[in-house]
Amino acid sequence: MSPTPPETVTPLWQQFLRWAARVGLAKRLAFALSLAALVAGFATYTALTESAPFGETNPRTVTWLLTLDLALLLLLGVLIARRIVYLWIGRRRGLAGSQMHVRLVAVFSLLAVAPAIIMAIFSTVFFYVGVQSWFSERVRTAVNESLAVASAYLHEHQQNIRADALAMANDLNQEAARLASDPERFEQVVATQAMLRALSEAIVFNGTTGAIVARSGYTFALEFDPIPDDKLATARRGEVAMIVSENDDRVRALVRLDRFADTYLYVGRMVEPRVLSHMASAEGAVREFGALESQRGSLQITFTLIFLCVALLLLLAAVWAGLIFATRLVRPISALIGAADRVRAGDLTVRVTERPAEDDLALLSRAFNRMTTEIESQRHALLSANRLIDSRRRFTETVLSGVSAGRDGLDAEGRITLSKFSAARLLGVKDAESLIGMRLAELVPEMGGLLHEAPGRPGLVVQDQIKIRRDGTTPLTLLVRISTEGRGSGMMRGYVVTFDEHHRTWSPAQRKAAWARRRPIAASPTRVKNPLTPIQLSAEPCAASTLKEITSDTEVFTMCTDTIVRQVDDIRRMVDEFSAFARMPQPVMKPCNLNDLVRQAVFLQSSAHAGKIKFDMALPQGPLTVPCDSRQISQALTNLLQNAADAIEGRPPPAEGTELPPGHVAIRVEADAERIAMIIEDNGKGLPTEERDRLTEPYVTTRAKGTGLGLAIVKKIMEDHGGVLTLEDREGGGARVGLVIPQHIPPASGTAAGDAPGGVGTPAETGEEKRHAAHGA
């Protein structure tokens, strides 16, 4: 037992793709991304403008929002690019509705892009103009002037306290002698000087030890705030050192007291807090203004990119919405187009899904379904009618198949619009369809006169006999009938041309009728021959006895009696041939040696024309046995050999100085597995060009004394033996006649002699039959 093959495990990614296609994950994801893009874009705009609900936004929040915007932008871009690629592929493949889908997407995208681009341009320009106004010269001057005013105010305080410090130091230096020895007074003087000069604090200290010599009021801030060394060094040089406190709420001055040993005056004055606050704000504004002005270019680019990102995000969301709307609009139209293509291809069972909504597309779908249903029912009716018409056509063709006449339908300009196979055969064309569209007057110029005459005789049939010859073949006599067809308004619609051979082979029924009519005639030759013998017997002795008594005009008398005897003999011969033709018996098929029959026939004719015509034979070796009627075959050979001898004797006289070649008749017998051909050639005057197709008809002859029954009898014999008679021109002059019979002749049909299928009116075979017989020979 063969092992069971392991089951194929589907990869997870294929399972995921199938699940995604089943639940419509792509559509759901696209909808979620579009909604998220709208929300993220609005949130980013609100955060950048510091509007509610964010208020003053944390930079990290803006960064996260911008990152989310970029991620959504990329995902939406991928989805839209994927959908556009599918649209492009569908258009390249020529899918139904793809071109309309592309146009709708282009229109919706343009409607979404145009406002966004316009707003982006105006917003960028507005932002650029706004930034330029922020950093204009007037704003820069105002900011700098505000800082200058604040600085001037503080500088004024510093100058005032400097002057007060110098004045107070000068007063203390003047009282140095008394104050140095009286510390209490020194402290009172310092307090008085501080109060007079509106100083909030003042102390005198020793620069070496740092000990306080005198103070005014509460001077804890001065005592505990360290004095920078550089300021102390400035004061030692005799200059006034200005000191600003760390919290900028007061201004201080340090000056050296020259009359005291290494002693310094350190005073301070409080500054208005609002003034200091304004000054700090002005300084901060100036710093920020400078920083922003230095980053103005990058700021413009950053805000422009952020705006473009948000705008592009919203734009892609709008484009995706347009794609979805266009798809929903085009899908039923594409279904209608595809269904229409299937209807065009012949599938009338196709139907489109009808939408439940009562909109125009739903009405169109229902109308299409009703239309296809009606067309399908009409098609079934037409097919039934066509089947009925086709059956009637086949019946008509079956009925008309026995009609040998050719029939062509022509339009008003004489072009063939309908042609029967028999018409093509009579005109020498293999395919009747090849005649469609050709002008009959150009194809058969002999019919041009009748076609020109027919329009002048509306309602009547124009007919005449014409002879046509094609490529050197035997002339063909046609009986042509032309009638016109009208539209009922006096305008001619076309022609109906019917033509047939004037002397065509009779049908079997016609032949039987003709042979039946000959039965009572078969007894006539006996009644005609009965008086001929007495006439001949009386003329000869009468001439012999009377000639002795006639003394004058004996030559005339002899000529007259010879004429009587000769004409009586000719009449007897004609009666014998007619009797043989009329009494043609049913052949009796027995095995016979054709070589012996040929030798006997040639011997009789060579004996009759000894010294005048040379007869040659070319026979196969050994006996050539075939079932046939030896008497009829001998009669056929005798008739043909006699015709050859008569053709040689009937040659026209040669031109002066020339001689006719010796008369020569050659007969050869050729056999193959199927046929035996007996071919007789002579160098006589040849076959006539006119009426050649009628040579095998009874009573048709070109000789003065011919009866016109010899070839008719031969043709009848060949037909009874299942063979054919061929008449052709011999190369170099003369005629070539062939008798072709099959090796195995089918049994007789049992018809009586009078019902034989051959007979009067049987023409020679067509050229194709002759060629076939010659090829078989």
UniProtKB/Swiss-Prot annotation:
Coiled coil: none annotated. Its EC number is 2.7.13.3. The chain crosses the membrane at residues 29-49, 61-81, 107-127, 202-222, 305-325. It is a multi-pass membrane protein. GO terms for molecular function: ATP binding; protein histidine kinase activity. The keyword Acetylation does not apply. Residues 745-777 are annotated as: Disordered. Pfam families: HAMP, HATPase_c, NtrY_N. It comes from the Bacteria. Residues 327-380 form the HAMP domain. GO terms for biological process: nitrogen fixation; phosphorelay signal transduction system. It is an enzyme of class 2 (transferase). The keyword Manganese does not apply. It catalyses: ATP + protein L-histidine = ADP + protein N-phospho-L-histidine. It is found in: Cell membrane. PANTHER family: SENSOR PROTEIN CREC (PTHR44936), SENSOR PROTEIN RSTB (PTHR44936:SF10). This is Nitrogen regulation protein NtrY homolog. It comes from Azospirillum brasilense.
